[in-house]
Amino acid sequence: FKSPFNRSNLFYEIRPKHNAEHDIIRFIKQRAGKSGIIYCLSRKKVEELAELLLANGIKALAYHAGMDAQTRANNQDDFLMERVDVIVATIAFGMGIDKPDVRYVIHYDIPKSLEGYYQETGRAGRDGGEGHCLTFYSYKDIQKLEKFMQGKPVAEQEIGKLLLLETVSYAESSMCRRKTLLHYFGEEYGESNCGCCDNCVNPKPKVDAK
């Protein structure tokens, strides 16, 4: 049985967001020369993080909708042609990007929905090689996202909150990430241990992100 949703070559990991910048620099340096995408929610964070990586000797560029089209196109080409290793982006990046050998996708901020998470992490390992999907989680980020929703139409707020709750329970769960993700898409994952997510490799007490 082959599941259309199961990306068996992707490793899913959630970390509490205590010292994310430091963790990201270490993570990338351990994978020198490999291609990766880092997603942030705000353009400001995209710029800051790209600068921080450059200052730490990592070839990185920013990408977001606030940049002019030419700069965006150039930065995208530099990433595709491997003149840089890392693109730090808002979710505007990746639509129609086909780079098969992206080795990791990092979410600096928790995505607004599991569907978004699945789509964005799915940009790793399209060549069938390994892909590491690392997400940083803190409850502060959730509160920030909830604040963003205020002022939107009530129905939209309700849907947004539900989607966010699903992401929170995924992040805080100690169950197999793959099982939870597939269940969300209406599929059951038969194995009790996928061997390819943080919860299966290092079973741990519940992450309490403060």
What is the role of each PLM region?
Residues 1-154, 159-162, 187-191, 196-199:
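Helicase motor core with emphasis on the C-terminal RecA-like subdomain
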Residues 163, 168-210:
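Cys/His-rich short segments
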